[in-house]
């Protein structure tokens, strides 16, 4: 079920046309990873689709290298504040038929810094949006999650440790205030 109707999706969908409408986030992050200021502006962007492997080749170039340093500081701040990082392997699932029998293949994809950069940039933009909504007293949906339940390793390793940490995470809930 589409989130928006076909007419709206054609107007505002990312990468559907040559130029797409967007909200662009400019975020000033200090050395401790805290947001010191931000700007949210309507913009027009040209979307270029890349695989994570293609993006990986661009990670050392600007502006991605500078963006990576900013998102690294933000991630370190979140870690020091107690954020849980559940690092599950990304997998590609393929189903094919062999002699009229379905064959399911799993391929474990390597962890890539480009994938982490995208995730951390989205978290940072979400934090700026939340700060804006709070400052302007706008009703805004927040995902709220209490700390994990006690009784587990605070620094799990390996796949089994990550599954155990995920099981200790209480369900998140949606709220309109932080």
Predicted regions and their residues:
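Electropositive polyanion-binding surfaces
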Residues: 1-178
